UniProtKB/Swiss-Prot annotation:
It is an enzyme of class 2 (transferase). The lineage of its organism: Bacteria, Bacillati, Bacillota, Clostridia, Eubacteriales. This is Acetate kinase. Catalyzes the formation of acetyl phosphate from acetate and ATP. Can also catalyze the reverse reaction. ATP binds at K14, H208, L209, G210, N211, G212, D283, F284, R285, G331, L332, G333, E334, N335. It comes from Heliobacterium modesticaldum (strain ATCC 51547 / Ice1). Homodimer.
Length: 397
């Protein structure tokens, strides 16, 4: 089965094409600035030269059309025709409590995704545009929606409910949903394989640390708690998101600074986090570089980030009555030995002990010292492959 994976944003569209017989990546690409000036497609076929096509791309229909044309081109294509594309898998951010698993796209599932626009106004509408564009450009090709929230639907009620008036919270579906579920699920499965143990026997804490960051407690294969909440704003300090904060600070700031609801939302989502603390950047590489030069605010931002991660690890170890493995993934988790060291220092009571030399390496690795009872691992995430796997799983029958 040849599966096209689509991650559709409001003005961009990422794609990857997989041959699921071997789980082989055939090509990947990015369509940028949809509906804006300077739009382009960057196509990267495996084993061939990269191709950049600069052209007017008014909407997602045109973006998908260009994607299919690139994949089937006689020079830089990787399949002979669009008829070879057997299925399309879409990343959809929010499945609410409607979807506890990925779902084949049909009239009902599409209506249910649209019904969640109110709780995911930035992410779900572009996903639907991508789905509809594929329906237009690849008629008859089955599609699957894979939800960032679905993996977390196993979280128990005492962990996902907020202590608001019960009827009010239920009326507005106001609860913890969690995100990055596809990534957390993938790296947990891979870590179990690396350890040579069944996932169902393990207590794993997965740390997806990038510009967006979240932590999940996975008890014997099931998500039992996660740091992001009703939206991706809750939990860890992030590149530009504030993370956990006293909610009373919101009306206080609105009153003192004369901010609207939109402005305070923008402040907490786009101007806070390590960017807000450092005043320098949301990119952790920049912060590490500046901190090494003596920038105290950059160091403070890094220390605050590491402390929050460590605090969640301790909490989730308590939730699961221990932990067998801690997994680092995503941009910062995979590529920053110093951040992994900062997070893991002081966790010896959990059986955590890093091997300093292994921690300096790159790529997939068990970076624990010999004899450590809690394994610390680095696993590069691959959300696109996980989406392709779910698409294949639901359609192969």
């Amino acid at each position: 089965m040849i599966v096209l994976v689509i991650n559709s944003g409001s003005s961009s569209l990422k794609y990857q094409l997989f041959d699921m017989r071997k789980e082989a990546l055939l090509a990947k690409g990015l369509v940028e600035r949809i509906g804006l000036s300077g739009s382009m497609l960057t196509h990267r076929p495996i084993g061939k030269d990269q191709v950049v096509i600069e052209t007017e791309i008014l909407n997602h229909d045109r973006a998908i059309q260009l994607t299919v044309e690139a994949l089937t081109h006689e020079d830089h294509g990787v399949v002979a025709s669009m008829r070879e594309i057997d299925a399309v898998g879409h990343r959809v951010a929010h499945g609410g409590d409607t979807f506890s698993d990925s779902a084949v796209v049909n009239e009902q599932s599409l209506a249910n995704i649209r019904a969640l626009f109110e709780v995911a106004p930035l992410h779900n509408p572009p996903a639907v545009m991508g789905i509809e564009a594929c329906q237009h450009m690849l008629p008859g090709v089955p599609q699957v929606a894979v939800f960032d929230t679905a993996f977390h639907q196993t979280i128990p009620g005492y962990a996902y409910n907020y202590a608001l008036p019960y009827e009010l919270a239920a009326k507005h579906s106001l609860r913890r949903y969690g995100f990055h579920g596809t990534s957390h699920k993938y790296v947990a499965q891979w870590a179990a394989a690396m350890l040579g143990r069944p996932l169902e026997d393990l207590r794993i804490i997965t740390c997806h640390l990038g510009n967006g960051a979240s932590i999940t407690a996975i008890d014997r294969g099931r998500s039992v708690d996660t740091s992001m909440g009703f939206t991706p704003l809750e939990g860890l300090i992030m590149g530009t998101r504030v993370g956990d904060m006293d909610p009373a600070a919101v009306p206080f700031l609105m009153e003192k600074e004369g901010l609207t609801t939109g402005q305070i939302n923008d402040l907490m989502n786009k101007k806070s986090g390590v960017l807000g603390v450092s005043g320098v950047s949301s990119d952790f590489r920049d912060l590490e570089e500046e901190a090494a030069k003596g920038n105290e605010r950059c160091q403070l931002a890094l220390d605050m980030f590491a402390y929050r991660v460590k605090k969640y690890i301790g909490a989730y170890a308590a939730v699961m009555n221990g932990v067998d493995a801690i997994v680092f993934t995503a941009g910062l988790g995979e590529n920053s030995p110093s951040m992994r060291q900062s997070v893991c220092s002081g966790l010896s009571y959990l059986g955590v002990q890093l091997d300093e030399e292994k921690n300096k390496g790159r790529g997939e690795a068990d970076i624990s010292a010999a004899g450590a009872t809690c394994r610390v691992m680095v696993v590069p995430t691959n959300e696109e492959l996980m989406i392709a796997r779910d698409t294949y799983r639901l359609l192969k029958g």
